[in-house]
């Protein structure tokens, strides 16, 4: 469902952006952007497009879903417009600088465009030592002519930076001066930042995803992953093992993949050649110590679940117990 929702969001955002590029207002905005590049007074008149966020826990597959969606949406890397002899890049993906540098992000956008269409916008900007205001005009013009959808990954970098609000403000100005859609991708940490002010929250409405719940989908993923065994002794996955994987991964798929992979690696190296709870626990203790602080709450819930199940006389399925624990 996440992949379908992300695909739909990106597709519609790209469509809205492309529809504006051949309008009269777009030509008027090009003139305004030219004045901005000269350091003169200018106005954003095209506007009308949108910015949105895709926020989710690290490791749940956001970037993979976005990459697949972009591949499906853009069968060709470039859209060539015969009437204007111009080239449009459907999706440009950049990373938010670690220090939330406005100038760094703008130059990164120009560099990405140069790589795709063979232009020299980046070199020109460096040569003339363009100021931030001039760069905003330059990137707005480039985006209006050559970019359909701009995706800014690792947006959570704005949270702990003094320039965070300035960078988001720059993206807002870029929307108003170019008419393109901008998607910001990050972790739940960035949601707290955007919720701190109304103008930020309004610009960041979008999709939010959490780690998986203990349900049929999680069980199915575990069974599929467990089938890829490279040890000499083949074992079958049990409900207890699936429960253990959930408790020690917090429902994050990438952690489950890493646990099963490292457990097999350890089992092969120590000669036991068997994927079981012993090898999984050894992998967790030796290879995932840095994650223990994040996964401990889930493990404690799992222990409470086990104790409660032993104390009760009624028969309760594992999925129901875990589901009740997660709800509480």
Where are these regions (language model features)?
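The feature captures the helix immediately C-terminal to the Walker
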Residues: 67-71, 257
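Mid-core helix/loop region of P-loop NTP-binding domains shared across ATPases and GTPases
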Residues: 27-37, 43-47, 101-108, 116-164, ...
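Walker A/P-loop nucleotide-binding motif
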Residues: 42-67
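The catalytic "switch" region of P-loop NTPases
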Residues: 139, 159, 169-236, 240
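Post-Walker A helix-loop "phosphate-sensing" segment adjacent to the P-loop in P-loop NTPases
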Residues: 72-83, 115-118
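C-terminal alpha-helical "lid" subdomain
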Residues: 215-216, 223-328
């Amino acid at each position: 469902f996440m992949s379908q929702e992300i695909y739909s969001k990106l597709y519609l955002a790209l469509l809205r952006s492309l529809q504006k590029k051949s309008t009269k207002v777009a030509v008027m905005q090009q003139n305004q952007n030219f004045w901005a590049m000269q350091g003169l007074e200018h106005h954003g008149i095209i506007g009308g497009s949108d910015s949105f966020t895709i926020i989710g826990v690290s490791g749940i597959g956001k970037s993979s879903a976005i990459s697949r969606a972009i591949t499906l949406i853009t069968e060709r890397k470039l859209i060539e417009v015969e009437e204007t002899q111009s080239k449009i890049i459907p999706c440009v993906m950049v990373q938010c600088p670690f220090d939330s540098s406005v100038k760094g992000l703008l130059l990164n956008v120009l560099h990405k465009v140069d790589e795709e269409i063979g232009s020299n916008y980046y070199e020109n900007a460096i040569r003339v030592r363009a100021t931030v205001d001039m760069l905003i005009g330059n990137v707005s013009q480039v985006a209006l002519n050559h970019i359909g959808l701009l995706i800014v990954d690792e947006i959570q970098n704005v949270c702990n930076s003094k320039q965070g609000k300035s960078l988001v403000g720059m993206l807002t100005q870029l929307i108003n001066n170019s008419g393109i859609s901008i998607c910001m991708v990050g972790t739940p940490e960035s949601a707290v930042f955007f919720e701190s002010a109304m103008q930020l929250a309004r610009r960041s409405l979008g999709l939010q995803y959490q780690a998986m719940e203990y349900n049929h989908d999680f069980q199915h993923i575990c069974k599929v992953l467990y089938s890829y065994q490279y040890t000499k002794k083949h074992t079958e996955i049990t409900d207890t093992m699936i429960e253990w994987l959930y408790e020690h991964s917090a429902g994050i798929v990438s952690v489950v993949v890493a646990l099963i992979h490292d457990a097999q690696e350890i089992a092969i190296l120590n000669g036991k050649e068997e994927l079981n709870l012993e090898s999984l626990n050894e992998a967790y203790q030796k290879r995932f110590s840095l994650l223990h602080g994040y996964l401990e709450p889930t493990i404690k819930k799992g222990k409470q679940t086990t104790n409660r199940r032993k104390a009760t006389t009624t028969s309760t399925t594992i999925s129901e117990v875990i589901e009740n624990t997660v709800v509480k």
